[in-house]
Each structure stands twice: as structure tokens, then as C-alpha cells.
Amino acid sequence: MISRRHFLQASIASSFIFNSLGINNSSKVMAQQNISEKNLLDFKSFGNVSIMHITDIHGQLKPLYFREPDINLGVGNVLGKPPHITGKEFLKYFNIPVKSADAYSLSSEGFSSLAKTYGKMGGLDRIATVVKSIRSERPNALLLDGGDTWQGSYTALKTNGMDMVKAFNLLEVNAMTSHWEFTLGIERVMELVDNHLNFPFLGANIFDTEWDERAFEPYTFTEQNGKKIAIIGQAFPYMPIANPSWMFPGLSFGIREKNIQEIVNEVKSKNADLVVLLSHNGFDVDRQLATRTEGIDIIFCGHTHDALPIPIIENKTLLVASGSNGKFLSRIDLNVDKGIKDFKYRLIPIFSDVISSDKEMANLINEERKPFLSILKEEIGETDSVLYRRGNFNGTWDDLICNAIIDERGADIALSPGFRWGPSLIPGSKITIEDIYNATAMSYPKVYLTEMTGNTLKIILEDVADNLFNPDPYYQQGGDMVRVGGMGYKIDINKSQGNRISEMTMLKTGDRIEPEKKYKVGGWASVNENTEGPPVWELVEKYIRRKKIIQIEKNNSVKVITG
């Protein structure tokens, strides 16, 4: 494990903003604490290469609230290592004062109250301001997109990703990789890549199954201050497992460790001074990959939505985690001379009330949203609870979705996927149609209703649990744990596959779920092609309209054994 001293030495020039921050209830708290655009962007240029990174935007054009996880368990070699520490432990580990701006942006501690103080984060118009500011002093600074960009909002759904393509073209991104992009269907992906995207769509690990040839560009070269930079793209390796393979027939993915090493060797043979892996593997996969390959200087991580204030170092490789939903933009300046000699890093928090809106990007966003604005802004209810998704187990957004499935479809048990995307709502917020789509907008949304035996339910839970808690990161193949409604269970994350789940119980009666008994189960986002049922957003809208006020009780239905 890297020591805290090693962390601090590795990013000696890394710039946090919390040093002068306290907290009070004043509406002028930002000004009082000297949190200004100038303060947030203050960064003395360093070295000869500058790179910016954003990832997992999930279609979010506008500022939002996003609560970080309060539980993000690690197993095996990553137990107790970042990013598998949360809340107070996270703040203590990185020496971040409680109630500070950094505590709000990077942890779940006091989220609801701090959100009222520090406000929303993100917004591509604010990100555009940051990008332009950095490029004003470093004109050739690279901007890399880690993927999960074209999906996750109403406008992305209705435009089939075109709104995000336009926005990222305007940002002048230099390269991207992918995951959820392929749920638009391979034909749409190719249409956007071939006819609309102004920068490389990289996927060194995506192969044509018929010819066993690469289906996309594996890497691209660029130059900055005389230094040749190789950017290798690594798409999400488990697409056919986690998402519907019928949407992208003829393609295979995978980690392809040997393939990556061969490409690294290839770009080095072509005189690359710096080798960058733009990855959507997930942080733990990237950490292991760094220990099993040689010659990768930086991995820009994606998929798991982790936000870390400083890079992690594994086997001389820097791992950068830039969060999700537009909350952060990473900037790293490097002194490059046949590899990294030194670096300076900052995870820039995009506080929407502080960073000014870029007019050009704001105009584009307004134009993309204009045809749908009356729908997006329609208020259908209000929440008394914080609605969030991110975390290993049930979040309140998914509790709401499960409740809607049970009530509207007459199910005994509801299953909701362990997706990490979707903004949060703070207590007292109106719930709009846009909010529902932000938590559900995807291309296979149908809510099925079927019968499953207790045995089948256990197999499903065991399978997902192994995808999350297998001690070998290369077998961690999905999102967070499937969310459940109407039932509870106990999970021992350290046991082997098939032995983690026990004490499955019907919450309404307290009865144990019987292996051979059939139960009426509703769920959504099935990867099966012929799934029948209404779209999930339709059920959730009906449920909220009927309830009017949403109040989610604390969910204690999942008992987690970690020791």
C-alpha cells in the first residue's frame, strides 16, 4: 500500500482549495471563504505538457447535485485503499476538513446541508470556461474524454447522443473512449463517429469478431512543445456482459492485457515521449493493469466514477480519477523527457455558482434543450428525502424506482440495476420529468414482470455480487450491487461465489424466501432483446404523481458482513 507520505510527496504541487475554508450559513459563504473562479483555477504552469481529463459525464449538460458514495467496499489487495474509503475515513485519509468545500465535493458527509451552502456542481458551460482558461496559458493543452458521454439524460436519449457530440466538439476534445455509447446501437455509433465527431474515438480493445481485427483506432499521436504523446484508448472491457450484446453485434471487447503491452511497445518504437492510457476499465482494473504492464506513464481512469484529490502511483504509472457527471476536471502538468520526470496535479471542482458560464457553450446547450424545455421543466412532485444513487448497495433513487415497480406492476419483489449514473436531489426539491430521465434515460428501459423461484433470485444476486466483490479486479465486470425492493438479504463480501448471499427474506411478511417457491418479480434494463413492458420512466412518473410527496425511509434490508 502506498503510504500517506508517498501520496503527499508524489503530488507535492497538487493544489487543494480547502486550506482557508470553514463554514457558516451565509448565502455569501463562497465570497467569505475566498472561493472564486480565480482561486479555483489558480495553477502555476509547470513542465512542457498539460493534459485535462473529464469522464462519465452521462449526458449532463447542466449543473447538478451529485452525492458521492457512503459505501464503496474494496476486497483483496485493494481493501482499505482509495477509492475504497468513504465519508469521514476519506476526509481523514486525505486530511480534508469536515464541512469544507472539498468535503462537500468529494464525500457524502453532510451532503444535504452542505449542498445548500455550496450549491450545484458541473455544467458543460462551466467546464468550457475552465478549458478555455487553461488553454489561454497553455494553448496546446490536451482535453481527454473517458467515455460514458452520450447517454444518461433526456436530451441525449432524444437526440441519440447528438447533443453531447456537438458539445464535446465545441470543447475541442482531443480524444475519447467509450462504454454506454454502444447502447445507442452500433449503427448510430458509427454514424456519429464517421460523420459528426471531430476527434478520435479510440478503442484498442474493440475487435471485429469475424475478421479478428481492430474495429476502431487503437491510439493517436499528438505533440506538445516538441514532445510526442501517444494516447491509447481502452473501452469498457465487459460490454457484452453488462449491456445488451445484440445492440453491437460483431464486436468483442475484453481487457486484452497482452494487446495493451504490444501497443505500448509499438508507440514507444515510434518515439513516443509520453504514453497515456485513456481508460474506461474501472479504477481497480486499471490499478492491476498498471502492475502487470510496463511503459504506461499515465492512466486516466473512468467507469467507476471515483474522484480522488491526488493521483495514485502503481509501478511508476500515475492513475488519475476525475469523478463523474461534470463535477470535476483534472489538470496535470508534466515535465516530460522520455517519460515523466516530475508533475503537478489538480482536481478542479466545478462549483457552478463560482465558475462563470461560457456564452458559446451556454448558447449551444440552450439550443439543444429548447425543443424539450416544457417537458423537462414539468414538476410532478416533491421529495422530502435526499435522492441519490451512488454506493455499493441500495440508494434512495433506486428505492423509489423499486417502490414504483412494486406498486405500478403489482410485483412482490423489484430489481433495479446497480447503475452509478444519475444526479441527486436534495430534500425540498421539486421533482421534474427531467429528474426522472436523469435516473433512467437509456435505450433498453422496459419494465418486465415475471415469475422467479427463490433459487433464481439467489443466483442473480450471487452473480452480481461476484462481479462487484471478486478479489481479482479482472473479474469485476459490472456496476454496483443490484438494488432490491420488497426483499432483504445478508451478504458476506469475503466469501466465494455462490456463498455470499443468505437469509433472503420477504420484507412484508418476514418470511424466508423459499428456494422452490415462485415470486412475482419486476425489474428493468434487461439485456434480453425481446423484453416486454412499459418504460421505467413512465412507471416512476405515475408513482410520483400519485404520491405527490416522496419520503424514502432508511433502508436496512441489506445486511453487509465485511470482516
Range-by-range predicted roles:
Residues 345-356, 506-510, 526:
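Short, solvent-exposed aromatic-acidic interface loops
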Residues 316, 384-389, 442-444:
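Flexible glycine/proline-enriched surface loops and loop-helix/loop-strand junctions
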